[in-house]
Amino acid sequence: MRWLKCLNNGLVSLSSYKHLFNMNIAESGAVGDAITVHDFSEKILEQTVHFHVIKLNGGFFLWVGSNPVLSNLAVSMESKFDSMPLSTLVLGDPSDTTPNSLAQRLTKRTKKQVYVSYGLPMTDSNLSLLVENRIKKEMEVHPDKF
């Protein structure tokens, strides 16, 4: 069995790695579907918001923020038992439901597994709505990036 070395010098099996990111990796090490990266920015309510999308096979990772910090990471996926996608907060402040809600709505829209890291302050409720509208606009213009 092939093993991949982790950043923390631990070992994880190739099959575990494939399952974690739902990727299609051949035993030779070649990637079936390429991982792509897409970046865009927008000035929203006098604040520059950056978006970073990493497209995976069967899903994508979306980072939203104004500072380069990974925070409030949520994951969402479809459920065969409920029309509302499942979601959980992996990292961050449990009182901030924005990443969970955004991940759920993106999963419902795309039918994909979605990871969302949302690093914007909860100071203005309009900000999260405008951010989500900007993401939807980008998805319409560049559907192949998500």
Which sequence ranges carry the predicted segments?
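C-terminal helix/juxtamembrane-tail motif
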Residues: 4, 137-146
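Short, internal acidic amphipathic alpha-helical interface segments
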Residues: 70-111
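Fold-independent oxyanion-binding glycine-rich loops
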Residues: 65-67, 93-94, 118-119
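Short, compact, well-ordered microdomains
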Residues: 107-139
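N-terminal/domain-start segments enriched in small and hydrophobic, helix-friendly residues
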Residues: 29-33, 41-42, 85-91, 142
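N-terminal, charge-rich interaction modules
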Residues: 2-69, 74-77
